[in-house]
Design a protein with these regions (language model features):
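Glycine-rich, flexible loop/turn motifs
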Residues: 11, 52, 87-89, 114, ...
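Conserved beta-strand segments of alpha/beta enzyme cores
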Residues: 43, 90, 114-117, 132
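Short, well-ordered coil↔helix boundary/capping segments
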Residues: 97, 112, 153-157
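Catalytic-core regions of hydrolytic enzymes
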Residues: 1-105, 109
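Active-site-adjacent mobile loop/cap segments within catalytic or ligand-binding domains
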Residues: 66, 73-80, 117-176
Length: 176
């Protein structure tokens, strides 16, 4: 399984309330997802494990070169600072949507967030990965409710557990 923490290094991603940077929210969530999966005996690779920049192509090249079974890109959303009312999770797919549906269901079941659904999108990392892939938007750094949650380490662990639970469920149903 390749876990792809969005942005990093020179690319902070979205910047939200109080200067909250997407890259700094996403990395601890991604590291915790990785830890949980590894505890279950799952081979996990990260596209980045600290604060450095990786190109979009570099992210999917890694997954394609190692012939990964799954690619999970983790991001935080933004709507512009003029819209602090916009909050919630979204999960994206390009081809097969089963992985996205499974992760989405696990998040909605276990994390107190507005549900903005599962959507199809032509994001580069989804189009160019050769395995089932998903992009999870864990909340809005520009959303008043979400930003407070995303900055909280306990919430980050809760979100990571939900994402990892979805990945494990998908593997058990489709890859074993």
């Amino acid at each position: 399984v390749v876990i792809d923490p969005g942005h990093g290094g020179k690319d902070p991603g979205a910047i939200g309330i109080g200067g909250l940077q997407e890259k700094n929210v996403i990395l601890p969530i991604s590291l915790e997802v990785t830890r949980i999966l590894q505890q279950q005996g799952i081979d996990v690779r990260l596209t980045r494990d600290s604060d450095f920049f990786v190109t979009l192509q570099g992210r999917t090249d890694l997954a394609n070169q190692i012939d990964a079974d799954l690619f999970v890109s983790i991001h935080a959303n933004s709507m512009g600072k003029a819209r602090p009312d916009v909050n919630g999770i979204e999960v994206y797919y390009f081809g097969d949507r089963r992985l996205s549906d499974t992760i989405h269901r696990n998040i909605v079941r276990s994390v107190d967030m507005r549900d903005r659904g599962v959507r199809r999108a032509r994001f580069y990392v989804l189009r160019t990965s050769k395995m089932p892939s998903t992009l999870v938007e864990v909340g809005f750094v520009t959303g008043a409710e979400d930003a407070a949650k995303l900055a909280n380490a306990n919430f980050q662990r809760q979100m990571a557990a939900a994402i990892a639970g979805g990945i494990i469920e998908y593997i058990q149903r489709n890859l074993r």
